[in-house]
């Protein structure tokens, strides 16, 4: 399994159209707010050219890529944290995500209504961000009240948690998101994560653009805003993605080249998701199955083994490792071994992106 990415944003910005194009689903994408009521979930394969190159050598009976769970969450509006629009139920859906893709409308189209009557990319982005902040403030203040009562009764063990809550509240009240990387202490980090804060999730903008001058201005404004709050922007012509979704792979590739687009939206989203979540991919290769596995960057060999089965982690002995480059250069496992490129690694080995692994374990 890869990761779960929630598509969020105001109503009518292109979230469901993007979801449809990427997952090739046919959920409603109507021109009125809240046409998405329940979150729509699509599982898409993560494109990885390395699987194709490995399969040229391995010739496995089955090739299994890792996957991305894409979730189309109903449009949020100003006041959602107070129950406006479809309210808090959708803020709770966001809590389940590993990462958030925030779609912002940068295109002009008189046929598609805007909830505020006019397009302003910075304001639109800020509306959603503020709702996430308000929701987190409510969560933290409720927790703070409970802890205050226990502290007054003499429970000093909660003093550190109380201090962390106050720090987070201070950050949010200044208009900033809570940044997990600001907390290096493992115990502090564990407590912060237990709050399940929306603003602590990795998030990036998807600018839904067109080729007009006004769209370019809206995009530039969004970039300026994103830089101020340390977020990043991916440009996507969602309408174009919708048009090419039904084409076969070669026609899609030809069309993208003709339009001067380097890669489809799915690839951009996955790359950015892997980057902000700190994820890598390793492979297992054999005659029956060639498979990609997603792993948190910096994971040790037993943790990688545990991605396959908990018994592998519990009884881990050694891992046979070949880098992707060596595996390809020397024509597979046998050639890599003959040239001294197969390594035996122990429990302290930190997995690298592209490693081909075979685990030895005993339970």
Question: Which residues does each PLM region occupy?
Answer:
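Conserved G1/Walker A P-loop phosphate-binding module
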Residues: 1-113, 122, 147
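Long, charged N-terminal accessory/stalk domains
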Residues: 90-194, 234
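C-terminal-of-GTPase-core extension/linker across diverse P-loop GTPases
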Residues: 2-8, 13, 19, 148-350, ...
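Short, intrinsically disordered, mixed-charge
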Residues: 24, 56, 92, 130, ...
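Residue-level signal for pocket-adjacent positions within structured domains
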Residues: 22-32, 39-41, 46-49, 53, ...
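Short, glycine/charged-enriched secondary-structure capping and boundary segments
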Residues: 83-86, 115-118, 219-221, 248-250
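Conserved nucleotide-binding/hydrolysis micro-motifs of P-loop NTPases
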Residues: 24-25, 50-51, 75-77, 105-111, ...
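Amphipathic alpha-helical transducer elements in NTP-driven molecular machines
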Residues: 34, 48-51, 64-70, 84-97, ...
């Amino acid at each position: 399994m890869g990761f779960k990415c929630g598509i969020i944003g105001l109503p009518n910005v292109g979230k469901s159209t993007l979801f449809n194009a990427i997952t090739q689903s046919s959920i409603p994408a109507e021109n009125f707010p809240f046409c998405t009521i329940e979150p729509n979930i699509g599982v898409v394969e993560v494109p990885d050219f390395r699987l194709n190159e490995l399969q040229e050598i391995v010739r496995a009976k089955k090739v299994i890529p890792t996957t991305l769970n894409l979730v189309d969450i109903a449009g949020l509006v100003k006041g959602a944290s107070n129950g406006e629009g479809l309210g808090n139920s959708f803020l709770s859906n966001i809590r389940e995500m590993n990462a958030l893709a925030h779609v912002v409308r940068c295109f002009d189209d008189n046929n598609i209504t805007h909830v505020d009557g006019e397009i302003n990319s910075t304001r639109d982005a800020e509306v959603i961000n503020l709702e996430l902040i308000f929701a987190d403030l409510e969560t933290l203040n409720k927790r703070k009240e409970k802890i205050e009562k226990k502290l007054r009764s003499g429970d000093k063990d909660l003093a550190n948690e109380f201090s962390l809550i106050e720090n987070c509240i201070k950050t949010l009240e200044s208009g900033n998101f809570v940044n997990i990387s600001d907390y290096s202490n493992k115990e502090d980090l564990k407590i912060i994560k237990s709050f399940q804060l929306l603003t602590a999730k990795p998030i990036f903008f998807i600018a839904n653009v067109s080729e007009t001058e006004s769209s370019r201005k809206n995009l530039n404004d969004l970039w300026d805003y994103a830089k101020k709050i340390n977020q990043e922007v991916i440009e996507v012509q969602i309408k174009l993605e919708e048009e090419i979704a039904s084409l076969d792979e070669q026609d899609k590739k030809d069309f993208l080249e003709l339009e001067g687009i380097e890669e489809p939206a799915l690839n951009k989203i996955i790359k950015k998701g892997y980057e902000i979540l700190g994820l890598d991919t390793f492979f297992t290769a054999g005659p029956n199955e060639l498979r990609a596995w997603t792993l948190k960057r910096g994971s040790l060999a037993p943790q990688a083994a545990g991605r396959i089965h908990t018994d592998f982690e519990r009884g881990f002995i050694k891992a046979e490792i070949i880098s992707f480059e060596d595996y390809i250069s020397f024509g597979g496992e046998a050639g890599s071994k003959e040239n001294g490129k197969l390594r035996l690694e122990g429990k302290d080995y930190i997995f690298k992106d592209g490693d081909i692994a075979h685990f030895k374990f005993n339970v």
